[in-house]
């Protein structure tokens, strides 16, 4: 993997900097590194592809070295370099695709394609290593089963989940009370509702709670908490739990009371925030517990009182809610990230070449399925293919 990254980094720099008119002295170190790459690769043969519709390709290396000059790089010099660069870029691209479409239930962190296994050989260690990539650093740590520290701006830690729980229900579905939620990506939307606006609740207050367990521990998280659940602020028709009928939800939004958010790790409370909105920070957690109340307004103007009558029919439904967004966090596991393209790159290559479903990843790289059942085998394989995708992204946009 180090060699593949070094090849890609060298080729990217060469493609960007070996251009007509450039002073040789400005790129002499790069050309020396480029020539070392050629010397190491010359005389070797590789084969890529041969899985799904990814074509089998054979690669052989026999390239001349780039010379020295006292002046600027001319057109002939650049053209010679470009021919070599283009071949190497095509090779690296195919090695990356070959690696991204393979998986293994055992030791999935290690190279799976024959081409990358060959590049891991001792004779290729002469290619200059550049381990400045965070993905490469973490791949090396994970490969040695040491502590890793992936940073994600918006980790897709929540599997998609959208449902409701009714604490009060009738066959007619005309006086309901309960909770509905939508968890997905890095966001939680939860709403508590009471058709009767807590008219018969103790002290005219309804209590709601929503608990979300994460598939992996997050640390040093910056979070936005808002006193509203925008996703549940408009009318909708909802299928009943048994699928036998539908019921009407017509929310009127109230501000939640006594809001509390707790971040827990292994059942122990790490951080607690009460009635605090905007930006908050959670140090270390694997569970989020949200609790809030719906309080019937003690004083109402006639127009508000008309929305919340003391008896049925209840045409408007009192609703309170919260939105929680994880803006950034550190996770030692590999996760899809809204600010990165690794999952999209891997998935698109596997779809483009009709790669058959293997023993590790779900069909279509379904992220909800993958993160819901996030086994060590899946994590190892995901770590490897995301690392390769990050290498490929340097050369192929």
Curated annotation (Swiss-Prot):
Ca(2+) binds at residues 266, 286. Coiled coil: none annotated. The N-terminus is blocked. Sumoylated with SUMO1 and SUMO2. Sumoylation of viral proteins seems to have a positive role on viral replication. GO terms for biological process: fusion of virus membrane with host plasma membrane. The keyword DNA repair does not apply. GO terms for cellular component: viral envelope; viral intermediate capsid. InterPro entries: Capsid_hemagglutn, Rotavirus_A/C_VP6, Virus_capsid_a-hlx_vir. The VP6 trimer contains a zinc ion located at the center of the molecule. The zinc ion is not essential for either trimerization or transcription activity of the DLP. Zinc-depleted VP6 has an increased sensitivity to proteases. This is Intermediate capsid protein VP6.
